Amino acid sequence: MTDSTLYLIKAFFLGIIEGLTEFIPVSSTGHLILIGDWINFTSSSGKVFEVVIQFGSILAVMWIFRARLWQLIRGTLTGVPAETAFTRNLLLAFLPAAVVGAIFIKTIKQVFYHPGVVAVTLVLGGLIMLWVERKTHHTPGDAPGAADDTASDERASAHTLEQISWKQALGVGVAQCLAMVPGTSRSGATIIGGMIAGIQRKTATEFSFFLAMPTMLGAATYDLYRNIDLLSQHDLSAIAVGFAAAFISALVVVRAVLRFVANHTYRGFAWYRIALGIVVAAWLMTK
């Protein structure tokens, strides 16, 4: 196998990882950092590669929600109250990360983009998810672990996207800022932040998907603009392969997640995060 073929295989594999992990609460950036290190994926345009495969993921979610997205745009432009309120909530949720990212993202990447940080945030994020799921379902008189995974979130005040208040949307936006630290997970921070704010789990997941559109498009476009000079002709084929792999795998995952959260909690993802964080920590100690 030639070096160029192996390089394309690695790019394809990382694209799959991006698509599989971007919209579940396990941290796509954390996985890309860890797996890229494990498989020794080196690219002169590594930053551009990561940005472009994120474009693949976000285009997948835009394609899946294309009808609802068009309804939202048309309703906002024509002054439909429910759609206008939803757009306002998306903007409110988008702004905190946009401001914090514009000011601190360079420092955050320099300080926190390390496997050790990923290990810690994976475990902490998993523990927080377990706590929130228990808090959401546990009611007085229940035995520990007695909550039914298929139960609705009784304490939630917002069960549809239209019921989300501006305060809840802003709370989700503040939570999204935490996702700038690798290993935290953008989807995890926004979904769990939404649940803490009183949004029902499935609705919080859907809101997270819609919030991903302006957030990821804005961040990816900005990163691409800043790092476009790093792009080389040699890496174009790998970037194209990674983009396609991320798009296709994200199509599968987003549909699967929407079906999953209708009848399940996020506890399984929480335990996965904790286990992976421990494995990564053990691996780092042996290096």
Curated annotation (Swiss-Prot):
The lineage of its organism: Bacteria, Pseudomonadati, Pseudomonadota, Betaproteobacteria, Burkholderiales. The keyword Cell wall biogenesis/degradation applies. Its EC number is 3.6.1.27. The gene is uppP. It is a multi-pass membrane protein. The chain crosses the membrane at residues 6-26, 45-65, 85-105, 111-131, 204-224, 238-258, 265-285. It is found in: Cell inner membrane. It catalyses: di-trans,octa-cis-undecaprenyl diphosphate + H2O = di-trans,octa-cis-undecaprenyl phosphate + phosphate + H(+). This is Undecaprenyl-diphosphatase. It comes from the Bacteria. It is an enzyme of class 3 (hydrolase). GO terms for cellular component: plasma membrane. GO terms for molecular function: undecaprenyl-diphosphatase activity. Belongs to the UppP family. Keywords: Antibiotic resistance, Cell inner membrane, Cell membrane, Cell shape, Cell wall biogenesis/degradation, Hydrolase, Membrane, Peptidoglycan synthesis, Transmembrane, Transmembrane helix. One of its GO terms (biological process) is cell wall organization. HAMAP family: Undec_diphosphatase. Catalyzes the dephosphorylation of undecaprenyl diphosphate (UPP). Confers resistance to bacitracin. Bacitracin is thought to be involved in the inhibition of peptidoglycan synthesis by sequestering undecaprenyl diphosphate, thereby reducing the pool of lipid carrier available. InterPro entries: UppP.
